């Protein structure tokens, strides 16, 4: 018999009925979903014992305590340590996903010389030869992004053995110098551009004390801190010193500026008060407020060692520059660093975990371990009124061919010691002095250093998760001028011209290297504006023939680039706000804009 129409209908009906009972379609859906979530390259947590380990975050100067939930030996989640005296149990978004940084694609994986892979021994030989070949007027410098560490001591010892060694730091690496901020007793903060509510000092410490201080934000951009402040006073870029002087006069009742008078009334009603920002006028304002050396103001601490601001190094004087870059630090100002190098034959060595940033301009790239891949240290937390120290034990296995920056400098100096040896000496010195107390992360208890049996026991406590905090330093006769040395000069602002009638300002820092696994949260949601976004007031855009969402071209005296126009009435008229990507190493620049 042939295949009839009845057979076709029977087969079709039976297949349809069978599909309702067979597990094949549902298995296909399940397997497809599982496979789509496990593409090659996505790290998979190990299956094993779940345990807790402790470390300290070194992505920024806050030095927050970290409790890591681990499966086997791999951390799968990070949270803050409850009761931590600096972080108050809080981690910032970058700290919460810090263990993801090891999986970023643009990592430096092996030593490079002239862009080509070399052995670490050859890199050491090349850098040593470059140092030996320097002329009598050329210096050798190390740019230290986190002064005050044991690694900083390694750098200073190495440079002390050279004829012209310079230990320097990025601008504002130590904005308050030998002083910390008594935030717990402060009742008002007058901020000149400081990101008080956006990563300033230790975020947990700021949030814990936010309810009892008034925040006045003085800056041209409507930043996140400005939007959350009790009062935002927009000022033109470069006029911050003038406004600080007006507030100082208003405190004596001698100004006609209404905004300055309002700020002065808030400061007088909420004492003790402090002013944070750069420039001599801000330092004089703190002297007027009597905030230096008193509770609720700026208090001195013991551990400060002054370091040269790289901006103060003479131009064209550095023959060999070693640059340490951290895993989570802000981009270093390459335009500034380039001016400090001798015009010809300068050698740049990048000690970095990244292939971008300064590595793009370096003659030698020495790959450094990523955060959590090697034993590290966290010095005194930013803005702390007492000295501090903690270890950051490794939680991840580091790839081969990585060299910690301090280890590289020790090998340059032909020192047989290791970086852990230097850290042990630091811990032994803390035990010998016998001051302060140690807060241990696992049990959230504080123990006086004098009650710890030996330096070895203190070292074990540090490795298990702990922070040492020194005792307070007695106050003394300090002046506001003592703070000026640490603040640094404000950035110059060029006035608009007929050719460039607008001011382009940097609004917000460039985002640090983030988690490669969390990018969908902002790439697909639009929560973060594009890197080429140019935000301006509606009137500013319309006066230049633009509409919201237009593509435009921004011109400055040094650069030209395409942008996407975004209207925002919170932006000051005559101002264009952009991220640091478009600023070409400047914070403020005159600019013009036209439709693309």
Q: What does each of the following model-derived ranges do?
A:
Residues 405-421:
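Non-catalytic, well-ordered alpha-helical segments in soluble enzyme domains
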């Amino acid at each position: 018999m042939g295949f009839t129409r009845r057979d076709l209908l029977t087969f079709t009906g039976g297949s349809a009925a069978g599909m309702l009972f067979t597990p094949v379609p549902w298995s296909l859906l399940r397997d497809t979903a599982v496979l789509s979530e496990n593409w090659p390259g996505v790290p998979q947590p190990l299956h094993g014992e779940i345990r807790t380990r402790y470390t300290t975050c070194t992505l920024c100067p806050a030095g927050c305590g970290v409790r890591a939930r681990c499966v086997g030996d791999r951390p799968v989640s990070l949270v803050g340590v409850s009761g931590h005296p600096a972080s108050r149990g809080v981690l910032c978004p970058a700290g919460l996903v810090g263990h993801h940084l090891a999986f970023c694609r643009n990592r430096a994986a092996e030593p490079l010389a002239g862009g080509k892979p070399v052995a670490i021994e050859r890199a050491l030989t090349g850098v040593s030869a470059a140092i030996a070949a320097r002329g009598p007027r050329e210096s050798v410098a190390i740019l230290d992004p986190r002064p005050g560490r044991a690694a900083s001591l390694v750098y200073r010892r190495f440079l002390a053995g050279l004829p012209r060694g310079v230990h320097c730091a990025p601008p504002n690496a130590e904005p308050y110098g030998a002083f910390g901020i008594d935030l717990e007793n402060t009742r008002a903060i007058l901020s000149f551009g400081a990101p008080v509510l956006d990563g300033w000092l230790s975020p947990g410490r700021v949030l814990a004390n936010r309810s009892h201080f008034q925040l006045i934000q003085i800056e041209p951009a409507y930043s996140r801190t400005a939007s959350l402040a009790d009062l935002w006073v927009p000022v033109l870029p470069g006029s911050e010193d003038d406004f600080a002087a007006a507030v100082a006069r208003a405190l004596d009742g001698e100004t006609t500026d209404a905004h300055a008078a309002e700020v002065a009334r808030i400061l007088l009603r909420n004492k003790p008060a402090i002013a944070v920002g750069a420039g001599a006028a801000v330092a004089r304002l703190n002297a007027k407020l009597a905030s230096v050396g008193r509770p609720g103001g700026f208090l001195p601490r013991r551990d400060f060692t002054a370091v040269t601001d790289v901006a103060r190094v003479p131009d064209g004087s550095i023959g060999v520059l070693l640059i340490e870059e951290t895993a989570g630090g802000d981009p270093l100002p390459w335009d500034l660093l380039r001016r400090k190098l001798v015009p010809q034959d300068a050698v740049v060595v990048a000690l970095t975990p990244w292939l971008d940033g300064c590595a793009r301009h370096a003659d030698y790239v020495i790959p450094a371990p990523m955060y959590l891949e090697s034993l590290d240290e966290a010095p005194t937390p930013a803005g702390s009124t007492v000295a501090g120290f903690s270890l950051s034990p490794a939680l991840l296995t580091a790839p081969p061919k990585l060299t910690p920056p301090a280890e590289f400098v020790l090998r340059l100096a032909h020192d047989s010691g290791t970086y852990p040896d230097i850290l042990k000496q630091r811990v032994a010195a803390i035990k010998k002095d016998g001051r302060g107390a140690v807060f241990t992360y696992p049990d959230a208890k504080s123990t006086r250093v004098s009650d710890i049996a030996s330096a070895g026991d203190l070292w074990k406590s540090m490795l298990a998760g702990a922070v040492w905090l020194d005792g307070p330093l007695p106050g003394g006769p300090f002046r506001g001028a003592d703070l000026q040395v640490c603040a640094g000069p404000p950035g110059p602002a060029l006035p608009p011209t007929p050719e460039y009638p607008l001011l382009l300002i940097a609004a917000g820092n460039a985002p640090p290297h983030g988690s490669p696994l969390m990018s969908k949260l902002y790439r697909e949601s639009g929560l973060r504006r594009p890197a080429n976004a140019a935000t301006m007031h509606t009137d500013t855009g319309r006066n230049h023939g633009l509409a919201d969402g237009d593509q435009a071209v921004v011109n400055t005296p040094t650069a030209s680039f395409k942008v996407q126009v975004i209207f925002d009435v919170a932006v000051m008229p005559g101002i264009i706000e952009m991220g640091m990507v478009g600023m070409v190493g400047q914070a403020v620049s005159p600019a013009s804009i036209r439709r693309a």
